[in-house]
Amino acid sequence: MASKASGGSTRNGRDSNSKRLGVKAFGGQFVKAGSIIIRQRGTKVHPGKNVGLGSDYTIFALKDGIVKFEEKGKKNFVSIEPVEASA
């Protein structure tokens, strides 16, 4: 016979890997086309001009330029101000 009752199983004791969400390029920063600007869950920030929205709601640059964040009403938008190449 067991001299000690078996310990009850715990319900906690798990932790998921961090998803590294958040802003990757801040306002006023220069980015190249294809660069990720924000990783997010849902559209906390909406895409503006010269910006694309991925299937996982990642916002990325479509053109080279300066990142610009703006509020329109209750919604936040991010867009890219294109920079003309000085030749």
From Swiss-Prot:
PANTHER family, per the entry: LARGE RIBOSOMAL SUBUNIT PROTEIN BL27M (PTHR15893:SF0), RIBOSOMAL PROTEIN L27 (PTHR15893)
Molecular functions (GO terms): structural constituent of ribosome
Gene3D superfamilies per record: 2.40.50.100
SUPFAM superfamilies: Ribosomal L27 protein-like
Record's protein name: Large ribosomal subunit protein bL27
Organism name: Hydrogenobaculum sp. (strain Y04AAS1)
Pfam family membership, one: Ribosomal_L27
Name of the encoding gene: rpmA
GO biological process, one term: translation
InterPro entries per record: Ribosomal_bL27 (IPR001684), Ribosomal_bL27_CS (IPR018261)
Top-rank taxon: Bacteria
